[in-house]
Amino acid sequence: MAAPLDFSNQSVADFCETIAAETSAPGGGSVAAVTGALAASLTAMAARFSKEQWEDAPGAVAQAEALKARLLPLAEEDARAYENVLLALRMPKEVDEDVRDAAIGDALSRAADVPMAIAEASVDVATLASELAERGNQNLHGDAAVAAFLAEAAVRASANLVEINLATREGDERLERARELVEIVRRITRRVSEARS
């Protein structure tokens, strides 16, 4: 039986239990989305404490909240998308092989869109967190840095899922974009690390 898909009303402990359950979905994509949302939340907190140090802090709060609102629903969307992959994989063997392969390929392609959206939003979180680490209240530099590193983890995890889902679609532009996002976020977090060295 599939786990419930209303993650927004679960406690952290319940969400962890849902992930740990012996079900195929939710899994890595949902965790990546929640990780990105947590990074956005931490970024919003650091921005709220940075209003005296950075005139753009109120805008950063709004941007971080918007990113969190984008990322949280992607946790549920990813679980649903992967359930559709599982349905395609469970098609009866009597179904024409070409039809079955096409259904699986289409489901995997659609399933790649969600982690791609998670990666895109999480790069934005990392960018904002990096700005806060540099310009915001330095008493919260560590929090802003943690937000950037969590966002990097969300990007890398999501990009990996894009590559897995599109493994049979050589030349798909989403593969290159996923790799590009990983490189972008690595540069961002490298700057955050070097700023405190």
Regions of interest found by a model, annotated:
Residues 158-169, 174-197:
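C-terminal auxiliary extensions adjacent to catalytic cores
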Residues 21-44, 139-157:
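Conserved phosphate/anionic-ligand binding catalytic regions in large, soluble enzymes, centered on
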Residues 7-26:
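Short, hydrophobic/aliphatic alpha-helical segments
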